């Protein structure tokens, strides 16, 4: 049994991202949100214990552990004390067992936005994520990173970077001590080089290197060059570098489509005779190049580096991680 497919009779799917429709609670039913947050905190401990049993020591906490967190103060939640105690228990367990916890707030946290209202909500949201780690008992550090993107260049990378830095200075010291930036997956946005030259040089923040994103936005660097440029930004703080690895959902589905065509002797000229397969093919054609695959078949090139944390971004979550761990065991046996 895994956590993603846990049967309902055993409690159902484990997640740290339960939420609710805004209309179902706002503004007079904060208890509903409090209930969701407590369930999320309880499941975080379930995740950590399962990870320990399976040799997984890196975990990304759901960014909606406190649903709609920019609409209230955490201490206003009816179950705040109980939630705080549970989160501290989670942090204590993670520290005792050598687990690293991180989080990745959603794409609406945009410090470089030209719109004041977007920036204000972003500042609140980032502070809530930092407060979550505070409740877990963590000293502010890039070890428990809050990972975001610049999330838009607005036609002028340099001006947007300056706005981003200006608003970064408005964050609390604890939040700034956790906030890291990740390279983008669009050529018009921010590569590792752009992040390094336009932002890191001014505030010394670490850069999370995303292998797949680099293929879309290289900044005229090879993968190896970008990897080590990002690594330098972690080394200067004495914190283990964290990277992201994923594979192409489009390529994953392409292999399945090709097998389907071969097995049934289908071509694009005859696919209309197979309505079910035609629907599958049309869905395949809609998949964006940047989309993450459900699983990963390979592991990233770490260029001889031993001290490195790799977050595997795959839709199947721990179901995608287990086969990788099995492969590693086989290699150790060999």
Walk through the language-model features, giving the residues of each.
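Multi-pass alpha-helical transmembrane bundles in non-GPCR membrane proteins
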Residues: 150-152, 157-167, 179-183
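Short active-site loop/helix that positions an aromatic residue
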Residues: 215-219
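Short, structured patches in soluble enzyme cores that scaffold and shape functional sites
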Residues: 105, 147-152, 181-185, 209-211, ...
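Contiguous N-terminal and early-domain "leader" segments and peripheral loops that mark the onset or edge
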Residues: 126, 132-133, 143-154, 210
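Alpha/beta catalytic barrel-like cores
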Residues: 1-100, 107-138, 142, 170, ...
